[in-house]
Amino acid sequence: MTNQDVVMPDIAAAAAMPGSSGRAPLFACRGAAAVSASSMLGGGGAAYQAAVVAHVAPVPAIRPCASWVVEAMRASSPTRPAAAAVDAEYDAWTQRKHPSALGSFEQVAAAASGKRVVVFLDYDGTLSPIVADPDMAFMSDEMRAAVRDVAEHFPAAIVTGRCVDKVQSFVGLPELYYAGSHGMDIKGPSSNEEEDTKILLQPAREFLPVINKAYKALMEKTKSTPGARVENNKFCLSVHFRCVDEKRWNPLAEQVKAVLRDYPELKLTQGRKVLEIRPSIMWDKGKAVEFLLKSLGFDDDRRDVLPVYIGDDRTDEDAFKVLRKRGQGLGILVSKCAKETDASYSLQDPAEKYTNAGAHVFVTMLLTVVFTAAVALALVNAVNSHDFAAHLAGVDCRMGLAGPVRCPASGFVELLVLALHVVRCVLAILDRLHACLMSPSLQLSIASPCHGVPCSIGAVEASAIIVSDAPEGLISTLTTDHIYYMTVFPAKLALTSEEV
């Protein structure tokens, strides 16, 4: 959970670039299951993988002095609660530079219009709360359900500093892509939880022996520091000092520095209450995002793709920079305080049921907007349709209208009544949708999405809207060859499709 490109003497400084909120053109439903791990390595994927490994050049490790390490530890790991002035600074930060992704969701939806969304998620601090014991950083069942729904419709990946095996056990979703060890261990989806995921890339494999040796040395060296914990993340090591008294930070930094003198192949970076030891190669979360996008067929020149990356730490800045360099994509920083970042938007963890409610609500809305936009577009198309009156008069709307209107005079009145009824039903459904969005227990489930039919919002060409008076509030959007049913419950949405 660190930024590989930031060396210790400069670790308190990062590039301050105001976030950009692209106003480009909602997104096509393209599930991760549609892009298998094997297909990633086909059609040029294997060649790209080989090229990536061949060009991961080692970089000289910079040995920071212990005083700089301690200053960096203090700078990025504040131990005092935020004052009112800090809160005011955060408000100004969100208003001027990095607006809330939830408050700006209309802009987010506009940026995703007509594009394929690819979702990248950090784990600690984003999907799970930050806890004292890293082995207890469990994500909530509600968050897991939201991520599962996202993965059903968009290619989705967990990009983390954790070991892949560890984060897979936490998340429990085999259909995701996983980039562990800060992107140095990338694996593709599997068909079930028992099956091993397919290894796609491990650019630091040759460093495994030295990492294991350094791990044993750090375990021995730091055992005299109460609260210190060394975690082996396979291709990197983490020295957690969250439970270490601040007075002991300097001795701990000296211990870590002493171990690294014997391993010039490794370098030291740091994140939130953790020191990271990683191979001295040019690889980070940003490179992992580039690899996954390339392997999925989304080259840099593809303008119909919108990568969305949500993370909370320095290490995620590498991914934010990649998205800004591409000129497309949304970086979203999860933070309770103002900080320099390359992210476009921000999310604050509100003190609600979940510590990570901000990310939970956002990924849920990411799905909900697909369906609400479909309804809105269908309504517009229906109103503009020349056949709208005929459809309203001739289609059984479960309101006792079995056939076409015969009397022109009474027909106008009946159509007016029907139109008002349609408006009332639509407003009631939108009110339910709003209640769903405001509920922290919102759940989304998709049943047989589109049966293989592309769910592109732009492809929905409705000639009529039929609103029933059924308790569940059924909306049927009549298209040329399919009928899409959207059922709205107080805390659940379901979209199904069947051929006409």
Swiss-Prot record:
Signal peptide start-end: none
GO molecular function, one term: trehalose-phosphatase activity
Catalytic reaction annotation: alpha,alpha-trehalose 6-phosphate + H2O = alpha,alpha-trehalose + phosphate
Pathway as given in its UniProt record: Glycan biosynthesis; trehalose biosynthesis
Top enzyme class: hydrolase
Pfam families given in the database record: Trehalose_PPase
Its EC number(s): 3.1.3.12
Keywords linked to the UniProt accession: Hydrolase, Stress response
Cofactor(s) in the UniProt record: a divalent metal cation
GO terms for biological process, alphabetical: trehalose biosynthetic process
SUPFAM superfamilies reported for this sequence: HAD-like (SSF56784)
Superkingdom assignment: Eukaryota
InterPro entries, alphabetized: HAD-like_sf, HAD-SF_hydro_IIB, HAD_sf, OTSB-like, Trehalose_PPase
Protein task: Removes the phosphate from trehalose 6-phosphate to produce free trehalose. Trehalose accumulation in plant may improve abiotic stress tolerance.
UniProt record similarity statement: Belongs to the trehalose phosphatase family.
Protein name per Swiss-Prot or TrEMBL: Probable trehalose-phosphate phosphatase 8
Source organism per UniProt: Oryza sativa subsp. japonica
